Amino acid sequence: MLGLDACELGAQLLELLRLALCARVLLADKEGGPPAVDEVLDEAVPEYRAPGRKSLLEIRQLDPDDRSLAKYKRVLLGPLPPAVDPSLPNVQVTRLTLLSEQAPGPVVMDLTGDLAVLKDQVFVLKEGVDYRVKISFKVHREIVSGLKCLHHTYRRGLRVDKTVYMVGSYGPSAQEYEFVTPVEEAPRGALVRGPYLVVSLFTDDDRTHHLSWEWGLCICQDWKD
């Protein structure tokens, strides 16, 4: 894509607001200067700990006398989210969909039921085709930052691939979010055909594991194999 759609722009603005508010909190709590350069969001730094999370209500009530910030928050955060079932997680992943113009139709993986059955199901991907992955999810109560979807692919017990999709930051909404990955090409050739086990994880910058599941993938010469 050459530009940003409304969802991507909103996610980036939401992340900027979160970082600005976290900076204020850190400055107020530490009674000193800004955080050290080493204290950055980097998974390669094992000692990194994310700043204390502020609830959506706390963010709305922060700096009530700052009119410009209050206006910015009203535009960005929108109305208060409707009440939801308290038993639901804050982030609810509903579906994973394989999209390909060369496929007979979308290949849909339902993630709202018994995830254990997915390990015994086989999702077919035709070799050499162009495809994208659509991730559908809901955010119910609090802002979530740095969502990412990871896929570890195994064959005969050995990991042969690791894919990470950076999904972004989102606020609570009654509407379901959809994130579509860039176009990729499926591998081809006799050496790559056959069954695989994929271990998937939906997580965020706080390393909260919102959902993890295993599923079967088979790269075949045709969609019906």
Curated annotation (Swiss-Prot):
Protein role: Inhibits GDP/GTP exchange reaction of RhoB. Interacts specifically with the GDP- and GTP-bound forms of post-translationally processed Rhob and Rhog proteins, both of which show a growth-regulated expression in mammalian cells. Stimulates the release of the GDP-bound but not the GTP-bound RhoB protein. Also inhibits the GDP/GTP exchange of RhoB but shows less ability to inhibit the dissociation of prebound GTP.
Tissue specificity field: Primarily expressed in pancreas and brain.
UniProt-listed InterPro entries: Ig_E-set, Rho_GDI, RhoGDI_dom_sf
Transmembrane segments: none
Gene Ontology biological-process entries: blastocyst hatching; negative regulation of cell adhesion; regulation of protein localization; Rho protein signal transduction
Family to which the UniProt record says this protein belongs: Belongs to the Rho GDI family.
The protein's name: Rho GDP-dissociation inhibitor 3
GO cellular component: cytoplasmic vesicle; cytosol; membrane; plasma membrane
Top-level taxon in the UniProt lineage: Eukaryota
Major localization class: cytoplasm
GO MF annotation list: GTPase activator activity; Rho GDP-dissociation inhibitor activity
Pfam families, sorted: Rho_GDI
Keywords in alphabetical order: Cytoplasm, GTPase activation
PANTHER family in UniProt: RHO GDP-DISSOCIATION INHIBITOR, RHO GDP-DISSOCIATION INHIBITOR 3
Chaperone keyword on record: no
Subcellular location: Cytoplasm
Protein source organism: Homo sapiens (Human)
